[in-house]
């Protein structure tokens, strides 16, 4: 996920204040600033616990060269609510922004279970204030999987006999109780030479293109039937920017992460007023702590003859 942009944008969330009604105008000041713990973390069923980002918000006039954003000294505790077990997490430094976070580094096995309930508690000192936040997630239940992708190899925006553009389609087996599914498309052969310049969605100059603006796309479906059964997801052509192989990952998503994704960029009401995204935290927290079950398939995009 675009973890870096989420962390930085979430850090700004505590310093934006709407002072207008109906006009769609935002006045950004430091008047409403209060220190907050900013969390961005996911538990993935069957995967290690890692990359739990814990940072802070900051004032707009803050010198970020002198103000550490990551709360490396925070006390971060993962709680397995079903087993009544506590797991203190350790900060792992890394040159990679995405990998700089808290993780489970003990020899004791820690397996995130489908259907399990977990809480995250964070205690940290920010600007002399003792802050605390807590969030709880229930991992989607077992049963989710990708059943089929059709076609697995296709020309870019291929057409059927009637001249209609064919959209690749993924069939999934749903996780009982889960109604939100996220599809991501990641190019595996990304380069200036494989970028699809002849597309109807943008006009890019090969000499100026920033490939990393196009290296990750996502779509979702929501409000699917609650019970077990199959649903279909389309891979839209505006999510495909390169010829070659693409990894398609679909996630069955818990309520916390779904609420964040649904509200993170939709913060303006029809009347022009603004609201915060939906943060499922108690206490002094912003951001998201959620969970998901992933499954993966691949598609190859061919050049037209």
Say what each PLM segment does.
Residues 1-8:
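Bacterial N-terminal signal peptides that target proteins for export
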Residues 17-20:
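C-terminal motif of bacterial Sec signal peptides marking the signal peptidase cleavage site
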Residues 8-15:
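Gram-negative bacterial Sec-dependent N-terminal signal peptides
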Residues 22-305:
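A sequence/structural signal for flexible, mid-protein segments enriched
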């Amino acid at each position: 996920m675009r973890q870096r942009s989420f962390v930085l944008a979430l850090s700004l969330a505590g310093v934006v204040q709407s002072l207008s009604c109906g006009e769609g105008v935002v006045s950004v000041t430091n008047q409403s600033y209060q220190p907050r713990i900013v969390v961005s973390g996911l538990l993935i069923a069957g995967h290690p616990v890692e990359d739990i980002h814990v940072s802070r918000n900051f004032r707009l006039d803050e010198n970020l060269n002198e103000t550490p954003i990551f709360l490396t000294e925070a006390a971060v505790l993962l709680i397995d609510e079903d087993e009544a077990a506590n797991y203190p997490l350790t900060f792992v430094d890394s040159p990679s922004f995405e990998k700089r976070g808290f993780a489970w580094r003990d020899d004791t096995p820690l397996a995130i279970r489908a259907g399990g309930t977990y809480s995250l508690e964070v205690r940290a000192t920010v600007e002399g204030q003792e802050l605390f936040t807590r969030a709880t997630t229930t991992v989607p239940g077992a049963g989710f999987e990708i059943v089929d992708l059709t076609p697995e190899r296709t020309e870019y925006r291929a057409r059927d006999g009637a001249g209609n553009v064919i959209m690749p389609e993924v069939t999934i087996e749903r996780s009982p109780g889960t109604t939100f599914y996220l599809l991501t498309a990641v190019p595996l052969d990304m380069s200036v030479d494989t970028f699809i310049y002849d597309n109807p969605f943008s006009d890019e100059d090969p000499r100026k293109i920033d490939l990393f603006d196009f290296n990750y796309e996502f779509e979702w479906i929501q409000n699917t039937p609650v019970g077990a059964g199959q649903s279909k997801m389309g891979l839209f052509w505006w999510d495909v920017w390169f010829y070659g192989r693409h990894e398609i990952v679909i996630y069955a998503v818990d309520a916390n992460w779904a609420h964040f994704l649904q509200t993170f960029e939709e913060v303006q009401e029809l009347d022009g007023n603004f609201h915060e995204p939906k943060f499922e935290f108690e206490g002094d927290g912003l951001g998201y702590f959620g969970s998901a079950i992933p499954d993966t398939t691949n598609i190859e995009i061919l050049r037209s003859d």
